[in-house]
Regions:
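Feature captures hydrophobic
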Residues: 1-103
Length: 103
């Protein structure tokens, strides 16, 4: 599928924006980059003092997975094991942040 043919859903975009803002507020910092392709990315989690370029700790998930995790944070492990969460780096396990942010 060509990138040009993929369009953002406005309702999903608004929901993702609100969820990312909540995560950023709950876990301020710039040690982890959380990417939601087509919709946005934030840097969050205090820790390693990262200043330029891409952080060593990265998480990439779809908008649908982000919404699922906000509704049920306990899904982190199973979604990661099924490959729906791509995470790298020592600080990339955001399961606790989702659990605390979206109780």
């Amino acid at each position: 599928m060509q990138k040009d043919s993929v369009k953002k859903d406005p309702a999903t975009a608004l929901q993702v924006k609100k969820l990312l803002e909540a995560i950023k507020k709950a876990a301020p910092g710039n040690a982890v980059e959380l990417r939601i392709p087509l919709y946005g990315a934030i840097q969050c989690v205090a820790g390693v003092n990262h200043r330029r370029g891409t952080p060593a700790n990265q998480v990439e998930i779809s908008a649908q997975v982000l919404i699922q995790l906000a509704q049920d944070p306990t899904l982190w492990s199973s979604l990661a094991q099924s490959g729906q969460i791509q995470a790298s780096g020592q600080l990339s396990d955001l399961s606790q942040i989702f659990s605390l942010t979206f109780k």
